[in-house]
Design a protein with these regions (language model features):
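Conserved catalytic alpha/beta core of Sir2/sirtuin-type deacylases, generalized to analogous enzyme cores
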Residues: 1-147
Length: 147
């Protein structure tokens, strides 16, 4: 994809606990990629501020929400991975895609949008379900080229 938005952050990154502004937007320049290294109490930045996972916890604002909305209104394909599609505001984002945009949901459990016509639900875990979604997209692309 040309635009992948990690709506709830990334577990391979950390940021200082004080990195949010009053507008609930984090300072991207203070985000640090740590790969799969552990982070714990005492892991601090150069100012002595404790690092925390670069993810959105329950009750926190979703800083990438407006970015996601801007991209979704022009999306050709949407792939949603590993979510119950119950918690708002993220649960409603798929509704902002164009009418002809296929929405793939990769999650082993049922979701509230399974019966929607544009939704293709791949009931599988992310590690294998995303690969299945890609294969389905490749086949669909071949069909469209042969028309």
């Amino acid at each position: 994809s040309s635009k992948v938005i990690h709506l709830h952050g990334e577990l391979t990154k950390v940021r200082p606990e004080d990195s949010y502004t009053e507008a609930d937007v984090y300072d991207e320049s203070r985000v640090k990629d740590i790969g799969y290294s552990a982070i714990g109490i005492g892991n601090v930045d150069e100012r002595g501020v404790q690092y925390r996972p670069h993810i959105v916890f329950f009750g926190e604002a979703v800083p990438k929400l407006s970015d996601a909305l801007r991209e979704l209104v022009e999306a050709d394909i949407m792939i949603i991975v590993g979510t119950s599609l119950v918690v708002q505001p993220a649960a409603s984002l798929w509704q902002f895609t164009p009418v002809d945009c296929p929405v793939y949901v990769v999650d082993p459990e049922d979701t509230p949008i399974d019966r929607e016509e544009s939704v293709i639900h791949i009931k599988d875990k992310a590690t294998t379900g995303v690969a299945r979604a890609i294969e389905m997209l490749k086949k669909e692309n071949i069909k469209q080229k042969n028309r």
